Amino acid sequence: GKPVSGVVVTDGAHFKTTDAQGNYVLNTDPARYPMVYISTPAAYELPSKEGVADGFYQYLDAGKSENQCDFVLTKRQKPVDEFVYIAISDPQVRNEKQLDRFRTETVPDLKQTADSLKNFEIVGMGLGDLVWDAMNLYAPYRQAVSNLGMTMFQLMGNHDFNLLYKSMTKTDHPADGYGEQNYYQSFGPANYSFNIGKVHVIAMKDIDYDGNKKYTERFTPEDLDWLRKDLSYVPKGNIVFLNVHAPVANNTVAAGGNARNANALFQLLRPYQVHIFSGHTHFYENQLPAPTIYEHNIGAACGAWWAGHVNRCGAPNGYLVVQVKGDD
């Protein structure tokens, strides 16, 4: 293959871009940053395995003083101008029975939607609470969202942490276990980005986890620092899709579950044309927290926690479909 230069590589804290030979050197601590991963450039296909985003991250061997992680990219035959973006929030499956409803209700519907839009490339984003604290359901969940006719990405919600542990930033000895560990093993990094068409897509966690279901909706200083660096590679004025679990500007739901430090986030996002996609509330709401920032807080795939067929606001269990054309 040919070396690809200018590809952004990160371990979740430090960043480098590949040189003319496609090489990069990153000083990292694998115990604290267990993966290294790329932000796929728009000129290349989104790497996936059986329709689930994969191959853009690699796990580091903490036992080695040096790891070599190479990534293979496939050049697109032509640039993408139009694509479809599907945001799916809160499948929140607690047990086999709920997973079965997701499999038999949500999944066929997603396949049908994808089939009706098959002239376009489709990107899917699971906005967190993929499971309900049930780490054993990650593998069957991944199986359920495979081969839907789209490239399926995920991010972390408050129910996607292993409740026995705190999040990595609050863990003194990660080798003994940490909250994100199971998620990392199943889906890769918590904060990452990729590019498609004219859009820079970011997925982030905005849950600060204390273990045993206790958490605060907020971005840690480390999260915001990662975002600042990621955005430094994106020209000002470009379109950014930011995907998070907890909303940043919800007004409807009492104590809206909003990320506490949304203003720090808005400062970083202001120079861009931003669409934020969030879940968490099981309630549909759109907000314009700043002139260039639009938030789509979407209802849940599980509705009111699989109790029936509707969300708390009465909208049916479902997901959001966005058609993107150029910068529209």
Language-model region placement:
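Hydrophobic beta-strand segments
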Residues: V7-D11, V36
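Extended active-site neighborhood of metal-dependent phosphoesterases/phosphodiesterases
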Residues: P41-K49, G55-F56, M135-K236, A259-F277, ...
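N-terminal active-site segment of His-dependent metallophosphoesterases
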Residues: E45-A139
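Short, acidic Ser/Thr/Gly-rich low-complexity loop/linker segments typical of extracellular
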Residues: T10-D29
